[in-house]
Structures are given as structure tokens and as C-alpha cells.
């Protein structure tokens, strides 16, 4: 009995269908790669479920994907005998996009076809790619373990809606028929389909078959009879797990196509590593570094991790237990000989085998990046532009590998004079001055604010390099990366400048003398500013600026306060140390003022200027403007 229903596509599906047809027209053949990839996944899922319920095979354990075409009708059919779908499953998977961050994805689309095609590729179009070439798509499917009369028919022309009906289907699995548009009839040609399968699906471990026509009986060249042959389903791909083959047998093109298969990325991977580990644990891993960051890299709900196989049997996607969060951009798989076939996420969580494999894989990825940085600096900069901020999470997460991760970090620097983050900590160490025992850095809201900070004045004068940090994550990073190769990282905006041997005896003596001579002025400023500052001192770091504010050692920096406030976290009140430069004309004129009210106003103005320079904002900008106008008016009289 028919149970036909009509459903409207989810809004995002309508958008995606429209975008695909208009943005992916230059690479139409990927529809076959996507549909074959889905069919192979369905076979993998059935193989996994059958581990605990062999009856799901229904006496047919030879899993495969079959592709056929009808030139006259203008159709292409992709059929598998995998896990299949129920009616509810069809409505869920073929009518909606069940992905977190979908709305954010659509916001990122620009309307420019070339850029959008990359984003859509990262999003993973899967089944919907059929509509790139088809005016209508028909799906017949039956879930493994369900009765023949519980099969489902799904049809749509890819516009606003789709129909679902109950049908009878003897065999389990899914059959997708594409009714090609008139201008896409080339894809009904068998040789065209074969070339696409060879190009995109050679690496898939499930056999991909096409019908090979038989030949009638015929006469041979010497008059002998050549017997007729029957038609048969011919395997068109190598149908072996690519990662189990020898590296020497696998071409770069095959590695890249396999990457696209597991990642659903349209762009090539930046680099990869394929290894077989033997010893206490035996496993194979194939790891890829993408060339582009996924659009949802910063989405907290985004799943990440490797595909897990046990003895060539697919177990799960997104096995995050094998990869730390700061390497969540890594794609690939791991195939273990030691884990049980019935392994679950819970078992993986506290498993000593898992922990040993995670340690090994993490070291492997860090090694890949170290080699890339050493061998191809330009390519490493490409990686850094995409994933550098994520890697900066590493020192906080992975104490054991903190030094290795630190060596992979890149920063802007006063040495290069550029905003590009190209300087490694090893580069910095190689240029340190004789007697220098600290790595100096500054964290600010922007590169310009860091590069032009008054806190750098003395260091610039002495030719001491300073690392310039301006990304949101930098303050978090620096709280967990306090030294590198026994050299302490020292903020130029926190506590004493501590130049050590870089400051000679004459300079120290002159500084002490200036502080002594300026003691009365310092006391007056302290009295004028009162509780708004923690302390007032003569500066040792300024040469051209009248004053600056400094965070005390152990106090929360202004950047960290901003991060905490942005996250809605309570922050303690932090009072700055106010450093003044008595050699600056403004400060020396201040010292001459006898009117204490005017002295207090000028002191407050200098303090707020320094805070504005340091933080980029003030707690009460209106009060600052009012005071400034008052001072201007007084001096215009």
C-alpha cells in the first residue's frame, strides 16, 4: 500500500542546491566521486554492524558498488549493497543538513563562484552533488535487516521539495538513479564513467564494478570459432585499502584522491605521512595536513579526529582520542591490529594502547611540521597562515611536547619590520646580543599597536629584537610558554625591564641618579593620582615618550583582562604602575607647576594618555575628553 508523502527541503538544502549548480559547474564530474564515496561508506558501516549481527548480510557478504548507464534514457545509476536506509533515515539524510554551524557556513559565502566552490567543497556536499548534473534524482533503498516491503522510494527535482513512498525492494542497500540534464548526457557514456572512476575512486577498498558486455560467437582469423562470452560485472578499481599498500606503489595522485575521499575537501592536501608502526603496538597511520583551514575550524561543536579502522574494518569517524585538540586540523586514519573489533569511544578514552598510539601519532605530526619548516619555509608559511593560531594552543595542552611546539611557532618581530609572522624562536636566539639572557616580547591589540608601543623605545635604541604578538590567543599562549631552550620569555610591558648585562655600569648609575633627583616629583605625582595607580616610578624603558603604564609581576595583563571580559568572566581590579620619563619636556614642565590642582590635572592627563596607548581604550573616555578640553581651554587663555 502506497504511503506517499511530499516534504519541503530544509532552507539550507535549498541554498546549497542552488549554490552547487551555479558554483561547481567547472568540476561537474565530482558528483560520481561523492556518490561512490557515500556508497563505500555504507558498505563500511554494514561491515561494522555485522560484527555483532551477522544476519544483516542476508547471505550476501560480498560488498560492492555497481555503476551502470543508459544512453537512450540519459540515466546513470549507482547501486550498493551496504547498510541502506529506513524511511526516517531517508527524510533525515536526504532532506536536511544535520551539521552544526550550518548557518555560519552560509554567512561565509561571498557570491563569487570560485571562492564559494572551495567553501562548498570543505562543507561536504555528498549526496546533493547529484543535482550538479541531474534534473531529477530517484533513490530506492532498503535498510539491512528490514523486510522487502519496508523499502523506500525518494524522488526530487532538486528545487523545493521531495516525495517519499514505501516500495518493495528484494535486495538491501541503496540505488540512486540520476536523470541527466540534456547538456550533461556525456556522463551516460560508459567510457566517460570509467575514466572518472579510475581518476577518483581507485583507492576505495570496496570493489566498484561496471557491466562488461559479453561477445557473441565469431570467426577467428584462421576460420576457427571463437566462443561467445557472457557479460559480467567488472571491477574497475584496485579495491584494496590504500593505506595497506606499500608506499612505493602509491602515486601522489592516489594519495591526494584518497585525501579528498576521507576529508570531502576539493583542494589538495599540503603534505602527508604514511607509516606502519611495529613493536609493542602495531598500527598503520595515514595523516594529512590540509592546505586550507575548514570553514568551521573554530566551531566548538565541530567533530574532529581520525577515522579508526581495526584490522581493516571501519569502526568510527572522528576518533578524537588519537589526536590532541591543537592538532584538530589533521585529517587521516589509523588502522590498529591491537584494539578489539567491538571497541567503543568509552573504551578508547581510558585505554593504554590508545594513549601510546596518541603519543606516537602526535610526535609524527610534529615531525612532519618540523621537516616542512626546515625544507620548505614558503610552504610552512602557507601552513602557518591557515593553522598557526590553532597550533598556539599546544603549549597549554601538551606539556610533554611544549618545547617542540614552541619551535614551530612563528611571530612578527622588530628585526624584520614586517607584520608577517615569519620569525621562529630559534631565529630569535641566533640573533641575541652578547650577554642577553631573555627573549623579549610584547602583546597588543594589533600589530601596529605592538610595533609602535613606547615600551620598545630603549630596546630599539640598543638594537634588541622584540617579538610582536597581536593575536587573541597570544596572551593565553604566553602564560603557558615561559621559557624556550633555557631562555626566559619576558614581557616588555610587565614589571622591570631587566636588561641584565645589556645595561652597563654607567647607564645604571645614571638611572639611579635620575631616580634620586626625581624623587620629589614622583611623590607629588603619587599624591595627585592617589588610588588610581599601584605605584609611580622613574622609567628605565622610555626615551621619547613622557610616560607609560606597566603591569606588575604576577598581575593580570590588560590583554588577559580583555580576554576574560570577552568571555564573560569576572576579573580582579588591577592597578597599573605609572612610569614617567623626567627627561621629557612635558614631565620637566610638570615639575615646575606650583598650582597643585593644575599639577593633578596634568598628571591625570598623562596617566590616561599612557593607558590609552597601552590598552587602546579607557574606562571613561568622556571624562578624558572633558579633562583634555579643560586643559586646552586653560592654555588658550
UniProtKB/Swiss-Prot annotation:
> Where found in the cell?
Cytoplasm
What GO annotations for molecular function exist for this entry? ATP binding; ATP hydrolysis activity; ATP-dependent protein folding chaperone; unfolded protein binding
Q: Where is this region: A?
A: 1-345
The record's section on SUPFAM superfamilies has:
ATPase domain of HSP90 chaperone/DNA topoisomerase II/histidine kinase (SSF55874), HSP90 C-terminal domain (SSF110942), Ribosomal protein S5 domain 2-like (SSF54211)
Matches recorded under SMART domains? HATPase_c
Kindly give the Gene3D superfamilies that the UniProt entry links to this protein: 3.30.230.80, 3.40.50.11260, Heat shock protein 90, C-terminal domain, Histidine kinase-like ATPase, C-terminal domain
Region named B: 346-562
Question: What are the TM regions of this chain, as residue ranges?
Answer: none
Q: Does the keyword DNA repair apply?
A: no
Q: Which PROSITE patterns match?
A: HSP90 (PS00298)
Q: Name one GO cellular component term.
A: cytoplasm
Q: Which UniProt keywords apply?
A: ATP-binding, Chaperone, Cytoplasm, Nucleotide-binding, Stress response
Ranges where the record places region C:
563-637
Principal place of residence: cytoplasm
Q: Which family does it belong to?
A: Belongs to the heat shock protein 90 family.
What is the protein's quaternary organization? Homodimer.
> What is the name of this protein?
Chaperone protein HtpG
Q: What is the lineage of its organism?
A: Bacteria, Pseudomonadati, Pseudomonadota, Gammaproteobacteria, Alteromonadales
